């Protein structure tokens, strides 16, 4: 987890990838690792809810993998602006 941002009780856990070239399998692996890290964060943070996010340097054809958003850095600002309106499309991990 490279960046954690919390607003309105929801944590956004961001993993930044600086890869110039990547394939879908390496991105899928990164997503699964980020989901596991997010689960660990939630387990250690009482009453929390979190969304795993991958930020990349470059645009790709892939927008989501397993409901985890893949966000090119140049679209990050608009992603954050629209985050709460689109949260139902994203993987949210919370404590019961």
Predicted segments with their positions:
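Intrinsically disordered, low-complexity Ser/Thr/Pro/Gly-rich regulatory segments
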Residues: 1-96
């Amino acid at each position: 987890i490279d960046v954690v941002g919390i607003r309105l009780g929801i944590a956004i856990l961001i993993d930044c990838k600086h890869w110039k070239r990547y394939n879908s399998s390496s991105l899928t692996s990164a997503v699964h690792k980020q989901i596991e890290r997010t689960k660990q964060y939630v387990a250690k943070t009482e009453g929390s809810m979190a969304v795993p996010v991958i930020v990349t340097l470059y645009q790709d054809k892939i927008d989501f993998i397993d409901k985890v958003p893949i966000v090119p850095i140049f679209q990050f600002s608009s992603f954050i602006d629209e985050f709460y309106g689109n949260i139902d499309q994203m993987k949210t991990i919370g404590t019961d």
